[in-house]
From Swiss-Prot:
GO terms for molecular function: L-serine transmembrane transporter activity; monoatomic ion transmembrane transporter activity; transmembrane transporter activity. Mitochondrial serine transporter that mediates transport of serine into mitochondria, an important step of the one-carbon metabolism pathway. Mitochondrial serine is converted to glycine and formate, which then exits to the cytosol where it is used to generate the charged folates that serve as one-carbon donors. GO terms for biological process: mitochondrial transmembrane transport; one-carbon metabolic process; serine import into mitochondrion. InterPro entries: Mtc (IPR004686). The modification N-acetylmethionine is found at residue 1. It comes from Bos taurus. The gene is SFXN3. This is Sideroflexin-3. One of its GO terms (cellular component) is mitochondrial inner membrane.
Length: 321
């Protein structure tokens, strides 16, 4: 076997990101919870393999599959811009187990006001850690912006949950089970735009097909943020809509009536099962490198592009996660 060539592009995902299947395979790998079990030594070994390869040094005996594995392990634990190790619960691989626990508890403890407030607060605290850990190096989040988004999203989630909780008192019990989902959806609509408010003020970079930067666009930022909000809400739908329906049916059966202690672990398991698939599949709904027609850009930027590159009809931007 010959030495591994140096022309493998590990700056990009392994699979074609222009197709939904390629994006789904990428995010199934990125969100794999098993990466959380890797030791510090294994993470450092993967970092060394990746950094050496980028520097033109191939680890002896390294195969292409091992290189890609090291790349995804490295990406799962280290910030792409700063190179710092991301705190454990802020990693993409922590999304499924952390959301399983928090979402499961939101669905279990939805009846009493103190528990509703606590779990909505904890969910937004976790979101703040994830957003800060995965902040962009191109448009960094300040502590003030983080705090404003955190307080606003928590207030919005709690207000929505408590408001709907009072409205559903006289409705069938099943309706009350969907209150946590409505609160999470409302919080996403508040949290993500606030977290990315700088992008809404100054725009995000747009490029041509070759990746050459053409300017900054607020229109592209709005489209990217909208796509992320939709993805996040869709991500929550299976885990917060399917288990309540199943549990409402099962709780009327003798099996659970005789074994009420099974309700909580069963609901948690259903949430986890939904999230294992919903998280990567909903991350893959829109391409990470999305496109927008030049005609939808700001007049100044559109005129600048048409003057310098009249043949360009579509530009590209990173939508974020």
């Amino acid at each position: 076997m010959g030495e591994l060539p140096l022309d493998i592009n590990i700056q990009e995902p392994r699979w074609d990101q222009r197709t939904f299947l390629g994006r789904a395979r990428h995010f199934f790998t990125v969100t794999d919870p098993r990466n959380l079990l890797l030791s510090g030594a294994q993470l450092e070994a993967s970092r060394n393999i990746v950094q050496n390869y980028r520097a033109g040094i191939v680890t002896p005996g390294l195969t292409e599959d091992q290189l890609w594995r090291a790349k995804y392990v490295y990406d799962s634990a280290f910030h792409p811009d700063t190179g710092e190790k991301v705190v454990l619960i802020g990693r993409m691989s922590a999304q499924v187990p952390m959301n399983m626990t928090i979402t499961g508890c939101m669905l279990i403890f939805y009846r009493k006001t103190p528990t509703v407030v606590f779990w909505q607060w904890l969910n937004q605290s976790f979101n703040a850690v994830v957003n800060y850990s995965n902040r962009s190096g191109d448009a960094p989040i300040t502590v003030r912006q983080l705090g404003m988004a955190y307080v606003s999203a928590t207030t919005g989630a709690v207000a929505t949950a408590l408001g709907l909780k009072s409205l559903t008192k006289h409705l069938p019990p099943l309706v009350g089970r969907f209150v946590p989902f409505a609160a999470v959806a409302a919080a996403n609509c508040i949290n993500i735009p606030l977290m990315r408010q700088r992008e809404l003020q100054v725009g995000i970079p747009v490029t041509n097909e070759q990746g050459q930067r053409l300017g900054h666009s607020v229109a592209a930022a709005k489209k990217g943020i909208f796509q992320v909000v939709i993805s996040r809400i869709c991500m929550a739908i299976p885990a917060m809509a399917i288990p309540p329906v199943i549990m409402d049916t099962l709780e009327k059966k003798d099996f659970l009536k005789r074994r009420p202690w099974l309700g909580a672990p069963l609901q948690m398991g259903l949430v986890g099962f939904c999230l294992v698939f919903a998280t990567p599949l909903c991350c893959a709904l829109f391409p990470q490198r999305s496109s927008i027609h030049v005609s939808r850009l700001e007049p100044e930027l559109r005129a600048q592009i048409q003057e310098q590159n009249p043949s360009i009809e579509v530009v590209y931007y990173n939508k974020g996660l």
